[in-house]
């Protein structure tokens, strides 16, 4: 990767951290956002599971809030407005924690996370899609590592080197 970076008058250290740029598309194929992801980050699975387990805590401020079909609340009701802002902040913080970056802006920049979509919050659909994506990417990267390791250890597993060099 470092070889592929054009001279940007950058004098620092460039490290390939495995980051990839991913487009977020709706069902019609339209790009609705972009985020950066490191599919080889082994900690991402634990972070995703933590967010999934904490989802009820994240949305707890919304328990007694009437959410409009467009994902908003009555602006005149200060308590509902404050509850929505608190839940949104919790969700954005959790999502940005997941990817250590711009997740919330990328996914929720064009649609409010608590907008209802097919009986669920939009953020639930987004997080489910991300979970499936993480699983596929991680499995693919692990398969690459296993393939590489097996090339180097094949002779030892088959007994080819059992008695040492002769």
Predicted regions and their residues:
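Generic detector of short, locally flexible boundary/turn motifs and exposed helical patches
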Residues: 1, 71-72, 96-97
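Short, charged/polar N-terminal "headpieces" of proteins
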Residues: 1-57, 148-159, 163-166
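N-proximal short alpha-helices
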Residues: 17, 77-80, 114-118
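Short, compositionally biased low-complexity segments
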Residues: 23-26, 54-65, 96-103
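Generic signal for short, ordered secondary-structure residues
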Residues: 30, 34-37, 73-74, 86, ...
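Acidic, aromatic-enriched beta-alpha/helix-loop junctions
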Residues: 41-83, 87
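C-terminal charged interaction modules
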Residues: 93, 97-166
């Amino acid at each position: 990767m470092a070889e592929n970076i054009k001279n940007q008058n950058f004098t620092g250290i460039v490290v390939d951290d495995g980051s990839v740029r991913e487009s977020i598309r709706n069902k019609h194929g339209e790009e609705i956002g972009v985020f950066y992801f490191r599919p080889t980050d082994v900690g991402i699975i634990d972070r995703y599971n933590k967010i999934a387990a904490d989802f009820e805590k994240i949305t707890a401020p919304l328990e007694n809030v009437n959410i409009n079909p467009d994902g908003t609340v009555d602006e005149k009701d200060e308590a509902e407005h404050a509850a929505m802002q608190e839940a949104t902040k919790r969700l954005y913080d959790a999502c940005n924690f997941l990817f250590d970056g711009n997740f919330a802006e990328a996914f929720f920049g064009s649609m409010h996370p608590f907008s209802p979509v097919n009986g669920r919050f939009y953020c639930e659909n987004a997080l489910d899609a991300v979970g499936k994506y993480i699983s596929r990417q991680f499995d693919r990267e692990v398969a690459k590592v296993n393939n590489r390791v097996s090339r180097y250890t094949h002779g030892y597993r088959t007994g080819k080197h059992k008695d040492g060099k002769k």
